[in-house]
């Protein structure tokens, strides 16, 4: 998948200001949760605006905490699947909560659907994804750079259909 790397504060802030406040974006995170190193760390932010994919690497020296916080606290609606653990990570790392979130998982649960994102996409969008590969990549080392093409494909696939599920 092609994507735009928002690899500087200037690009992140420009991206935020370019978004239409009435159009939601799909967002997800990859983090490290005591699997490869002690502690919890934000490793990647992936975004889909319905047309293009974007990646923010918060581990990059060119990306400041201020720019990442500006993204999460912006008024743009962020469509997520199961934001609870990601919001907890953001609070632990930055001391903030994510603003203006629509949680697809909360909606699915309210409608009686208890499955994960893959099963939700299969059920409602008739997609067929290989959950074995997804499971393997969930536990990859997201702190290690450079990220592989496989890791990036995995990360972007988590936001690809969220806007449709909303």
What are these regions (language model features)?
Residues 35-51:
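A short alpha/beta connector and helix-capping loop motif
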Residues 13-16, 44, 64-69:
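Short amphipathic alpha-helical segments and helix-helix/interface helices
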Residues 1-25, 29:
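N-terminal accessory regions of nucleic-acid-interacting proteins
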């Amino acid at each position: 998948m092609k994507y735009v790397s928002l690899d500087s504060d200037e690009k992140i802030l420009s991206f935020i200001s370019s978004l239409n406040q009435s159009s939601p974006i799909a967002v997800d995170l990859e983090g490290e949760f005591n699997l490869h190193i002690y502690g919890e760390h934000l490793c990647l932010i992936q975004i889909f605006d319905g047309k293009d994919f974007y990646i923010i690497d918060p581990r990059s020296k060119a990306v400041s905490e201020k720019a990442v916080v500006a993204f999460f606290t912006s008024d743009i609606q962020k469509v997520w699947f199961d934001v609870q653990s990601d919001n907890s990570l953001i609070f632990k790392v930055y001391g903030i909560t994510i603003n203006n979130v629509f949680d697809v998982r909360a909606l699915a649960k309210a409608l009686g659907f208890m499955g994960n994102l893959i099963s939700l996409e299969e059920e409602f969008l008739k997609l067929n994804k290989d959950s074995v590969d997804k499971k393997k990549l969930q536990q990859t080392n997201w702190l290690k750079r450079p990220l592989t093409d496989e890791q990036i494909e995995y990360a972007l696939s988590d936001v690809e259909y969220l806007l449709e599920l909303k």
